[in-house]
Design a protein with these regions (language model features):
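Short secondary-structure junctions
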Residues: 1, 155-160
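Periplasmic N-terminal soluble interaction domains immediately after the signal peptide in Gram-negative
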Residues: 1-11
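Short beta-alpha junctions and helix-cap segments that line functional grooves
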Residues: 3, 101-102, 165-167
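Catalytic-core regions of hydrolytic enzymes
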Residues: 9-11, 21-146, 150, 154
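Intrinsically disordered, low-complexity polar regions and short flexible loop motifs
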Residues: 17-18
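Active-site-adjacent mobile loop/cap segments within catalytic or ligand-binding domains
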Residues: 123, 159-222
Length: 222
């Protein structure tokens, strides 16, 4: 079917308008506040891969890219740490360090989501894939975790180990929907190389932001 010249011009106009409108459409995360928690840091390296890649560095890099993208979307990002430091104080105990991260969230009543970023490790280097953890203290924890997991699996291309229930301290003691993502296994040489790559880190951050946008787009609950 051939579109007449005049009509064809109008179709092109509509297409251009649609594209412009789509670009100008504000992010669903706009105006919302998210706490981002890069795991470990300072005196705690977290997992360390065979090539020496440290979990604390990957977590911080992905968290900072996520922070940047959220700001671009008009959202507010609160970081539990922005540098390679202990959140509580140098050499603080694990419970005190975890509570310090929770305290950052509790100090910001405007915060609506808590996202903790980690990498995995196992004694067997064949262990692979990404996964997301939640603790069902609100109606939305599992839903938030599911969105994160779906977007990470699609963007990262790693084996999807699914969403899992866990009693991690930061998931239980925050008062808002929270999830903890394990981006991949540093104990797996192939995944370690990916997780150290800045372009891959940015791709993961984009996935995290898409999940956050979907969460707010859907009104916060499934």
């Amino acid at each position: 079917h051939t579109i007449p010249g005049e009509a064809h011009g109008k179709v092109k106009e509509y297409l251009i308008i649609d594209i412009i409108t789509a670009k100008e459409q504000p992010s669903a995360a706009r105006g919302h506040t998210v706490v981002i928690d890069p795991g470990h840091g300072g005196s705690d390296s977290g997992a360390v891969g065979y090539a020496g890649v440290r979990e604390k560095d990957v977590a911080l890099a992905v968290a900072r890219y996520t922070e940047e993208l959220l700001h671009e979307a008009g959202a507010y990002a609160i970081m539990t740490r922005t540098e390679d430091v202990d959140v509580a104080h140098v050499g603080s105990s694990a419970p005190r360090e975890l509570q310090a991260r929770v305290d950052v969230s509790l100090a910001h009543p405007e915060a609506e989501l808590f996202l903790s970023v980690h990498c995995n490790s196992f004694t067997n280097p064949d262990a692979h894939g990404m996964e997301t953890y939640y603790y069902p203290k609100t109606d939305a924890d599992e839903h938030f975790a599911a969105l994160l997991n779906e977007e990470l699996a699609a963007a990262g291309g790693l084996y999807n180990r699914g969403i899992k229930y866990a009693k991690f301290y930061v998931l239980r003691h925050t008062e808002i929907p929270a999830a903890l993502v394990e981006l991949g296994f540093l104990s797996n040489p192939e995944e370690e190389a990916l997780l150290a790559d800045a372009a891959y880190q940015k791709r993961l951050a984009q996935a995290l932001v898409r999940a956050i946008e979907r969460y707010f787009e859907q009104g916060g609950e499934e």
